[in-house]
């Protein structure tokens, strides 16, 4: 038998198989083998959206996540949330892994666990060509315009103004005098530092208010609860009010008060306007909170980076106040709580993702 016979069916099958593989390999860059290897090429051909944030158990971040989910669904593209659980190394590693998984075909909206984390995250994104928006935390010496076009924007709060506003509501509810205790977030977080500065500013304006103690509860209701229990034992009737740097800690404080039958008797304030805090204002157990609209942040952070990636927005042509800015807050008290509840708690918040600058409250100010 002649094994060199050109009509040998076995030889023809082998030649056809080789030609198919060679042809597929030569066209791989153009995506011609997508039908042969759909799983391998999914990341390259499909844009992915991702929000990176602290925790799904925190009501604020759960709402932030829903904002991201809604934006991705509106674009009919996949959404892959990343939860740091307050661990900087995990947050950075998860972003690095998602960049690799998507081959950089990614739009990212990140709340860095700590300010220092932002530097590593931004450098990773720039290297991979990933468009990114950051929320709250970054070093003061880093600016989006130095990393154009990939670092699209940084959104922050005027923490001092927000912290002072809720403190003022608390002090007025106390009649302008008496002792308070205060719960802070993570000491190195920009929001925590700013909000504490706001409390200090309010204390200077109300000389008859005495700060009995200040402790960090790391934004957590679970950590706030035993701290407030201890304060109630230590200070007793000296406590006339409780200031909290966020509402999750405020809910921990409120639970401690409920356990002693003091809910509603000792006024409490916080920040973030989570649903439980809004409900507590309605019942009179909570005095005030401030909304920074995490649903909007979760949506708009992705919308900004997506617009830059698709060419609808050129970050390099935008003024600095569109690259780093404070978001406009809303103070919630008994006077407007029902309207806020109807529009932002009972109903899904309305977000115009084409109005990039509608909630800009001004450029970020630095102390140094």
Question: What does each model-found stretch correspond to?
Answer:
Residues 91, 153-180, 224, 273, ...:
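Hydrophobic alpha-helical segments within soluble ligand-binding/sensing domains
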Residues 121-161, 179, 274-282, 286-287:
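Flexible loop/hinge segments that line or gate small-molecule binding clefts
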Residues 45, 183, 187, 202, ...:
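Hinge/cleft segment of the Venus flytrap/periplasmic-binding protein
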């Amino acid at each position: 038998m002649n094994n060199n016979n050109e009509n040998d069916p076995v030889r023809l099958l082998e030649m056809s198989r080789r030609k198919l593989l060679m042809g597929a390999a030569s066209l791989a860059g153009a995506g011609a083998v997508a039908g042969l290897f759909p799983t391998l090429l999914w990341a390259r051909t499909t844009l992915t959206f991702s929000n990176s944030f602290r925790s799904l158990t925190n009501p604020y971040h759960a709402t932030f996540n829903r904002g991201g989910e809604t934006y991705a669904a509106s674009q009919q593209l996949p959404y892959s949330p990343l939860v740091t659980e307050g661990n900087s190394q995990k947050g950075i590693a998860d972003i690095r892994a998602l960049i690799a998984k998507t081959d950089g075909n990614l739009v990212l909206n990140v709340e860095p666990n700590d300010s220092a984390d932002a530097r590593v995250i931004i450098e990773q994104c720039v290297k991979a060509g990933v468009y990114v928006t950051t929320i709250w935390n970054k070093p003061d010496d880093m600016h989006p315009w130095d990393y154009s076009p990939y670092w699209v924007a940084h959104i922050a709060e005027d923490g001092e103004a927000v912290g002072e506003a809720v403190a003022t509501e608390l002090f007025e509810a106390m009649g302008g005098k008496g002792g308070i205790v205060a719960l802070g977030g993570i000491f190195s977080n920009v929001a925590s530092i700013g909000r504490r500065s706001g409390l200090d500013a309010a204390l200077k304006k109300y000389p008859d208010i005495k700060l009995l103690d200040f402790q960090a509860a790391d934004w957590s209701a679970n950590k706030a609860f035993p701290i407030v229990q201890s304060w109630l034992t230590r200070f007793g009737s000296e406590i006339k009010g409780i200031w909290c740097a966020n509402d999750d800690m405020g809910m921990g404080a409120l639970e401690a008060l409920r356990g002693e039958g003091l809910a509603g008797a000792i006024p409490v304030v916080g920040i973030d306007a989570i649903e439980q805090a809004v409900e507590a204002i309605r019942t009179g157990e909570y005095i005030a909170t401030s909304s920074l609209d995490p649903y909007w942040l979760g949506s708009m952070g992705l919308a900004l980076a997506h617009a830059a990636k698709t060419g609808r927005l050129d970050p390099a042509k935008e003024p600095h106040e569109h690259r780093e800015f404070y978001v406009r807050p809303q103070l919630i008290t008994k006077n407007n709580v029902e309207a806020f509840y109807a529009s932002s708690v009972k109903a899904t918040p309305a977000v115009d993702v084409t109005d990039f600058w509608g909630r800009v409250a001004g450029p970020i100010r630095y102390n140094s």
